[in-house]
Amino acid sequence: MNTYNDNPKQCLKKIVESASAKFNESVDIAVNLGVDSRKSEEQVRGTVVLPKGIGKNIKVAVFAQDKHLLEAEKAGADIAGGEDLVEEIKKGRKLDVDWCITTPDFMAKITPIAKVLGVKGLMPNPKFGTVTSNIAEAIKTIKSGQVKFGTDKNGVIHGKLGNIKFDIDDLLENLKAFLKVIKDNKPISAKGIYFKGVFLNSTMGKAYKIGKVEDII
């Protein structure tokens, strides 16, 4: 493992320059936090809008009715439907999307497919802004580059900052935004060092550890 203390831009440059796979590798991040994920109050979860996007079209499905359904279609939802869509999913229809959105008044109607959506991490959640009456704004925000994040059982957050075709400065901007939101979501009960380690790598490449996070953001 190579370390470039306090120089994330140099890390990103090395990652992009050394990528050798025959496909467009993603640039990944792993953030090791000083939290105890076994405690619910120390689980760090949320969303962040990466200012330079993630390098792919983010697909959104909307469950709604009446005016909200029309709003979803107009705002560019990849899939939009009401109870008919719920029935199709109950019968086995696959949803090839990254996010699902619904309205507060329709939330109860997707209960029959909650398990199906939940397994894929697609269940609408007010904390993620995906249970809302402002469908158009939610679609716009998500498609601009919104991603979910959360600590695993070891207190590590994994995410993607883009891909090796991104400009280095764009990757750096996404990195800063990602780390800032994690910093802002620090649990009150977390003691000691919060950012224990931040590592960057491409899909097939080796990991680079960056230095002191507080100096970056």
UniProtKB/Swiss-Prot annotation:
Family in the record: Belongs to the universal ribosomal protein uL1 family.
Species of origin: Wolbachia pipientis wMel
GO molecular-function term, one example from the UniProt record: rRNA binding
Name assigned to this protein: Large ribosomal subunit protein uL1
Function, as annotated: Binds directly to 23S rRNA. The L1 stalk is quite mobile in the ribosome, and is involved in E site tRNA release.
Key word Transcription regulation present: no
Gene Ontology CC: one annotated term: large ribosomal subunit
Subunit note: Part of the 50S ribosomal subunit.
Top-level division of the source organism's lineage: Bacteria
SUPFAM superfamilies per the UniProt record, alphabetical: Ribosomal protein L1
Gene Ontology biological process terms, A to Z: regulation of translation; translation
Keywords: Repressor, Ribonucleoprotein, Ribosomal protein, RNA-binding, rRNA-binding, Translation regulation, tRNA-binding
Organismal lineage: Bacteria, Pseudomonadati, Pseudomonadota, Alphaproteobacteria, Rickettsiales
